Amino acid sequence: MRMTLVHLSLSLFSCLLLVLSPTFIASTPVSEPELVVQEVNEKINASRRNLGVLSCGTGNPIDDCWRCDPKWEKNRQRLADCAIGFGKHAIGGRDGKIYVVTDSSDKDVVNPKPGTLRHAVIQDEPLWIIFARDMVIKLKEELIMNSFKTIDGRGASVHIAGGACITVQYVTNIIIHGVNIHDCKRKGNAYVRDSPSHYGWRTASDGDAVSIFGGSHVWVDHCSLSNCADGLIDAIHGSTAITISNNYLSHHNKVMLLGHSDSYTRDKNMQVTIAFNHFGEGLVQRMPRCRHGYFHVVNNDYTHWQMYAIGGSAAPTINSQGNRFLAPNDHVFKEVTKYEDAPRSKWKKWNWRSEGDLFLNGAFFTPSGGGASSSYAKASSLSARPSSLVASVTSNAGALFCRKGSRC
């Protein structure tokens, strides 16, 4: 992944941007991340208690927030109030207009055609982007998003596939929901527009499904992701305030990288919630692979991995709660965890803990650091949904089949 973005300008003022670094949109990290963990667990338990009241309830607090409404398509922006965890304040285009994508083409990435997805995401104002019909969108170059945008695939079968994919670079308040993103390719060495007034030269991209680079307040929910050139969801270079939830991930090697490098200490501010995802068939490693920050991994279903599930380096804090881990049959790869680039004398001081996880077929988690010490006391005050029920909570992971006039 990279940060090169050379702006061409329509004015002398814009030309000055050629010599400046991109604006870094920072998000102040939560000073007590355990309180966010506690809030997530409270919402999970509240949804569980409401199962007897809501006939459509699942115990998944995100889904129970909006999926019971048969008129969801008339109140699409309500979804923005349903996130949990570190990305809960990502409002996307909640306060803007609805933009309907009517054209699946992507012929001109410098002057995108109105009605295309690219034309929608580069606008300066908040927009809630929906799709007029089922579409397969093959992007010619990276889809560079502007701030305060929601991509909402509900009501259509939307595939972003076979070309470049989504880049969230130095922007904030992004929601990506209900789309299929797969077979992403490396692109680049081309001019690409990133706003109505600027376009710039993009160097070669890695081919991630969703690349978050210096982004904040980002929520990726109910997407199906697979088979891309590099990562499925990668977040680096100071990205933070992220929730990754209800996604179905499959057929991929390096699934999720959270943190740029061991030496990039700005990622100490990274805080990510990973909840209710199904890590499915054909996955190898990095579910996720973490550096520096705080990572809450809660109520996910791990049914396949070939090397390891959760790994990291540079002393990240990993809080694993109520997940289900089904190990592969190969006895060499039963361990859930992988401590990287450090001897045991160092990694034993990191804070990796497992609470209420379910381990099947010989799976095991190697904890480190304080474990259930005071640093986790607040996070432990309420447990996540029991891991034995994870299969039901994640049964609808991935892009949903939603039709107007009925519940999703």
From Swiss-Prot:
It comes from Arabidopsis thaliana. Gene3D superfamilies: Single-stranded right-handed beta-helix, Pectin lyase-like. Pathway: Glycan metabolism; pectin degradation; 2-dehydro-3-deoxy-D-gluconate from pectin: step 2/5. It holds the Pfam family Pectate_lyase_4. It is an enzyme of class 4 (lyase). Binds 1 Ca(2+) ion. Required for its activity. Glycans are attached at N45. Residues 1-27 form the signal peptide. Keywords: Calcium, Glycoprotein, Lyase, Metal-binding, Signal. The active site is at R286. It catalyses: Eliminative cleavage of (1->4)-alpha-D-galacturonan to give oligosaccharides with 4-deoxy-alpha-D-galact-4-enuronosyl groups at their non-reducing ends. One of its GO terms (biological process) is pectin catabolic process. Its EC number is 4.2.2.2. This is Probable pectate lyase 5. Belongs to the polysaccharide lyase 1 family. GO terms for cellular component: mitochondrion. Its cofactor is Ca(2+). GO terms for molecular function: metal ion binding; pectate lyase activity. InterPro entries: AmbAllergen, Pec_lyase, Pectin_lyas_fold, Pectin_lyase_fold/virulence, PEL. Ca(2+) binds at D206, D230, D234.
